[in-house]
Amino acid sequence: MSRGNTRQRIQDVALELFAERGYEKTSLREIAEQLGVTKAALYYHFKTKEDLVTSLFEDLVLGPADAVIAWAEAHQPTTLETKLEILNRYSACIGNATPLVRFMHENQAALRDLSIGEQMKTRILTLLQLIKDQDAALTDQVRCASALFTMHSTLFTLEGSNADPEEKRKAALEVAQELVTAAHHGSAPGPAPETGNARHE
């Protein structure tokens, strides 16, 4: 197994154990045992559990979110179509990291001592600035903030639903786009214009 594949395998197993047992109750020793490797082999890639979690966020959430932000900043001034595409791309980003986003919400207390929470907050606030107008009314600012929250929260608030994850992601995206469309026009929520699935350039 190559170094890159070993690192990814460690991340995958760690995330599974964190979800199953909780972050605080999972040790590096248990992760190594689950992988069938020595602690020394694990330490080669990650010296601490915090390093491991940080790598997960950097690879699966922070990096992709930065790519969305970079795309948005390159497409200024922000039109409604650009705002909707920002949501489209960010929805795909979250969809590709569903287990990690769920972990983030379920382990907020444990993550508070790490820099991850603050880094994620920074990205979300940056995205919020990109999808709302500077002179937006307070109600429209709330709509834009609610759009981002909707995409995050739907992943775990509808766990009892029979819909598959992709259907829930698309439904949350549709609602988020309706909210941002309403905020852009300064009116009550209405259907968002048609947009394709996430298009990466």
Where are these regions (language model features)?
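Helix-turn-helix
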Residues: 9, 13, 17-51, 55
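Hydrophobic alpha-helical connector segments
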Residues: 55, 66-100
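Secondary-structure edge/capping motif, primarily at the C-terminal ends of alpha-helices
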Residues: 71-75, 108, 158-162
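Hydrophobic/aromatic-rich alpha-helical bundle segments in the mid-to-C-terminal region
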Residues: 101-102, 113-201
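Short linear capping/connector segments at secondary-structure termini
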Residues: 104-110
